[in-house]
């Protein structure tokens, strides 16, 4: 018996990441080759014509799993009965714009969207914020949703999977091992250059990746800066931000959350107090996913170097939380 369609809301649907994302969702890459989907596409009024063009292309692919589409500039319509929400659209940082200004501008957007999700979506909705600063935007959306109730406040995530995938790629190149062999990668903290990609627990076919690398200077001076500043390097090379790799990471995050994973995955989730991270902070942590849910991997040793790195990225997130605190009252 065929499955009933699920509803997937995507914001910023006319943008570059949206364009890289929607066709893969419609083809079944995110939720499985047996799961029909209805796409509910949100973008600004001035982008509606472009959204219609994307919908025309989606129609022209004749995807067997694409059961319907909706285009709108109204969050209440976009999130109606949604089972999955990918919040891609965000205010980009403009010339001369301070980070505080960016946080304020996005705070307004994600307050509205969090409230609309909580009021309209499926009670078990899974929400992934891709639009930056994604940790704090997820925190804002979750805080707005919490005031409404209905939805699970732990299901408002920020996307750290791009950092996780970038780290795996760099380690594969360093060790000469295939990416597919690398397990138990962790990225702690904020999706920003302060993130801490931690391969102390990582293995490749049973071998310790830390022992294979055995080079602290490379870790500190090459690996971490390369992963942390990869987005800027891509903008410098391409003239545009990383869209396809961001869309790929969003697919990975949602796929594993919905369908499960046999490996640790990095997810930006509201902290439960683990590892000394204050409760509620949306923080990148190692998780395992099964049966449509996730749980934080517990009991990992945090050495002095790692604690210093974790505290640095936590400090940045605490500053961001403080900057938006007045908006959330």
Curated annotation (Swiss-Prot):
Would you tell me the protein name for this molecule?
A: Malate dehydrogenase
Q: Which organism is it from?
A: Aromatoleum aromaticum (strain DSM 19018 / LMG 30748 / EbN1) (Azoarcus sp. (strain EbN1))
Query: What are the entry keywords?
Result: NAD, Oxidoreductase, Tricarboxylic acid cycle
Gene name linked to the record: mdh
Q: What PANTHER family does UniProt report for this protein, alphabetically?
A: MALATE DEHYDROGENASE
Give the top-level enzyme category.
Answer: oxidoreductase
Signal recorded as keyword: no
* Stated role: Catalyzes the reversible oxidation of malate to oxaloacetate.
Q: What residues does substrate bind to? A: 93, 99, 132, 166
Molecular function via GO: L-malate dehydrogenase (NAD+) activity
* InterPro entries listed in its UniProt record: L-lactate/malate_DH, Lactate/malate_DH_C, Lactate/malate_DH_N, Lactate_DH/Glyco_Ohase_4_C, Malate_DH_type2, NAD(P)-bd_dom_sf
Cross-referenced NCBIfam families = MalateDH-SF1 (TIGR01759), PRK05442.1 (NF003916)
- What Enzyme Commission number(s) appear in the record? 1.1.1.37
Q: Which domain of life is it from?
A: Bacteria
Q: Does NAD appear among the keywords?
A: yes
Reactions catalysed, as given in the entry: (S)-malate + NAD(+) = oxaloacetate + NADH + H(+)
């Amino acid at each position: 018996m065929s499955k009933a369609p699920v509803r997937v809301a995507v914001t910023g649907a006319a943008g570059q990441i949206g364009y890289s994302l929607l066709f893969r969702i419609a083809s079944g890459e995110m939720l499985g080759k047996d799961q029909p989907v209805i796409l509910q596409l949100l973008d600004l009024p001035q982008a509606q014509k472009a959204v219609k063009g994307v919908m025309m292309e989606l129609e022209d692919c004749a995807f067997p799993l694409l059961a319907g589409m909706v285009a709108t500039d109204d969050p209440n319509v976009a999130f109606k009965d949604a089972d999955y929400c990918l919040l891609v659209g965000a205010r980009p940082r403009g010339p001369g714009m301070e980070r505080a200004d960016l946080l304020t501008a996005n705070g307004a957007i994600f307050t509205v969207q969090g409230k609309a999700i909580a009021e309209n979506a499926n009670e078990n909705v899974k929400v992934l914020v891709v639009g930056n600063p994604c940790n704090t935007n997820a925190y804002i959306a979750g805080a707005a949703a919490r005031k409404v109730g209905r939805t699970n406040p732990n299901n408002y995530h920020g996307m750290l999977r791009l950092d996780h995938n970038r780290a795996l790629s760099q380690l594969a190149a360093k060790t000469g091992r295939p990416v597919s062999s690398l397990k138990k990668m962790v990225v702690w903290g904020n999706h920003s250059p302060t993130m801490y990609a931690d391969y102390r627990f990582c293995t490749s076919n049973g071998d310790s990746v830390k022992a294979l690398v055995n080079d602290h200077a490379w870790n500190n001076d090459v690996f971490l800066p390369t992963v942390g500043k990869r987005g800027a390097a891509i903008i410098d090379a391409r003239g545009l931000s990383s869209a396809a790799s961001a869309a790929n990471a969003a697919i990975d995050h949602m796929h594993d959350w919905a369908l499960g994973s046999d490996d640790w995955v990095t997810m930006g989730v509201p902290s439960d107090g683990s590892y000394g991270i204050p409760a509620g902070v949306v923080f990148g942590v190692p998780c395992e996913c099964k049966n449509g849910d996730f749980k934080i991997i517990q009991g990992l040793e945090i050495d002095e170097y790692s604690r210093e790195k974790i505290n640095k990225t936590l400090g940045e997130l605490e500053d961001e939380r403080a900057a938006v605190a007045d908006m959330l009252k």
